[in-house]
Amino acid sequence: MRRRKWELAEYWLGMSTKENISTLEIPEGISVSMVDRTISVQGKLGTIKKDFTKLPAILVIENNIVKIQPYGKRRRDFAISKTARSIITNMIKGVQNGYKYKMKIVFAHFPITVKVKDGKVYVENFFGERKARISKIVGDSTKVTVEGDDVVISGPHLEDVSQTAANIELSTRVKNKDQRVFLDGIYVYSRE
């Protein structure tokens, strides 16, 4: 049976220099664990899991430090390890503080109404359309609330929150018209 590269971690760590290892310290009150190259981060706002099976690097968690070492020594390999490090950093920040996107409902003539039901956002009366435009809420821990002319999206997972905001914005895109004139829609105006 052929072995996978991450099963030979000791061999790879012994071969390369220590310069190309990117490290990340885990703050207090947060626990990071890894099972089958799936990293889970736990904190006061919940847990986040991310699968790193296709990452061409070695992941090691020791003494509250996450070590990421790429297999190669090229610039692209270092960029991949830095990207994985920033993803884990975003997971830690999300579990500590959470992320919040604020979107503004903009309309000129037909008043847009936004409702949240069953993990979906319904945009009604967009340009007087009788059928509601539907966009999906990504992730179980992502919450969407409507406060007047604002739509607030919050949650611990940055990718889920930003993808939900993108889904809402894309569902209200105006097609076959000049977008400088027809400005109706829902747009992101604040990221926290």
Predicted regions and their residues:
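Ribosome-associated RNA-binding proteins
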Residues: 2-192
